[in-house]
Every structure is written in C-alpha cells, then in structure tokens.
Amino acid sequence: MNEQCDLPATPLSPHRPLDEFYAAPAARQEFVNELFDEAAPDYDWVSGMMSFWSDRFYRKDGLWKAGLRSGMKLLDVASGTGLMISAALELGVDPAQVTGVDPSQGMLAQNRERNPKTVTLLEGKGESLPCADSTFNFVSMGYALRHVEDLRKLFGEFHRVLRPGGRVLILEITRPKSVVALHLMRFYMQKLVPRIGWLRRRNKSTAKLMQYYWATIAECVPPAVILSALEASGFKNVKRTTTGAVLSEYVAER
C-alpha cells in the first residue's frame, strides 16, 4: 500500500498532546519513561495478552519478511524488554552484532535479563540515537512509533545510522476502520486486559499502561502520514502491509 501524502516541514508528532495523561507536551517524555519503568515487569505478559500470544511469531515473521538475515548488524530502537531482539536471535543474528536503544531503565533491565550479555544495550531516544553514522544493515522498531516525539527526527536518525542499502522495519498497531472492530478493540484493551492484569499481579501500572496505549492508537496519525515521512527522510521502496486490519508493517530501504 502506497498512500503517501504531502507534509509541511515542521515537527511531526505521532499524535496530539494527550493532556489527560501529562500536563504539557514538555512533560511527555518523563511521563512515558516513568510509565514504562513501572510497567516493565508486566510488559511481556501485556504484549502477549494483547496479541492472543501471537506476538513472538509475528515479530520473527516480520523481521524475516523484511530481509533480516544472519551476518547483518541490527539496531533495535525503543527496544523495551527485548522481544524484537530475541526474535532476531532466533533468525540466526549474532548477539554481538545487535544493539538495542531505549529511554526506559526499567525496560532495559528486563532486556538484559532476557538476552545474551554480548548484546549491546544503550539508554537513549530514537530521535537522538547514540550511534555512529552508517553503522547498521537493519533497523527495527516494534510497537513504539506512537511513543516518540517527532517522526521526522526519528526517521532522519534511522537514515543516518543505516548503511547504504540498509532496511527498516516498523511494526505498529493501527486504529481499525470498522466501527464494530474499534469498539471491540477499545473494550479489550481498556477494560478486559487491565482487569485480568490486576487480578494477576495487582499492578496498577498495567491498567495505566493500557489506557495510554489505547489513547495513542486512537489518536495516531494515519498510515499515509507515516509513509510520507519515511519518503521525505530519504528512504526508498517505502511500503506498508497489514495483518488482521490492525497490524501494520512498514518497510523501507536507505
């Protein structure tokens, strides 16, 4: 699907300021970091629950279809608890050739527990990656596009750290077009998953995380804007495919 649109040259947030969660846009990053720090111990369970436990297969399949192979140097942005990295390792990627970047110390702690010590994990934001130019063959991002501040800066950084011919894969959840599907998805994410999470761990952060997750999905810019921003950042062969109407895979080449 190639539904790009023209964009003005200004900072491009993935969604409006969500003032029901933080007082001002400047407070957004601190809120997000704190939210993920608190929810980190339960994040893998939440991810599995939201996807009916298909998330691990979907990540691995997406990476393979986008062209990730052994011998490549991988950067996983907004790496979280390391689920994308684990999927890459299952495909034969050398752990010593993998770098993960995330702004949440809590998520990085979970990541370190999951993956080999030879994986490099760095604290940092996608819009200002702590990585040298033209370093990686592949950049991945799993379900974190909605949590950055500026898509243009993010994609510019992707382009900067990739080698010529390098590839990008962005996995994301997209707001369903069907009204029925929209209501079902809202109920599942805002009511059912938080309730089960509370019964399971008594962690209030799980409910808060799901409320925020849903808000970012409901308010996220449409796919056409994301595709156009990738093209404007210098990427070619930009495309989007979907699974089940709500799971989007954005791929592009440097």
Model-based region annotation:
Residues 73-128:
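Class I SAM-dependent methyltransferase SAM/SAH-binding core
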Residues 137-151:
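A short SAM/SAH-binding and catalytic strip from SAM-dependent methyltransferases
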Residues 233-254:
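Core SAM-dependent methyltransferase catalytic element
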Residues 152-164:
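A short glycine-rich, Lys/Arg-flanked "PGG" loop and its adjoining helix->strand segment in the class I
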Residues 166-173:
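Conserved beta-strand signature within the Rossmann-like core of class I S-adenosyl-L-methionine
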Residues 101, 175-229, 233, 239:
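C-terminal alpha-helical "lid/dimerization" subdomain adjacent to the S-adenosyl-L-methionine
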Residues 127-138:
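A short acidic, Gly/Pro-enriched loop at the edge of an enzyme's catalytic core
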Residues 52-72, 87:
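Conserved alpha-helix/loop element of class I SAM-dependent methyltransferases that forms part
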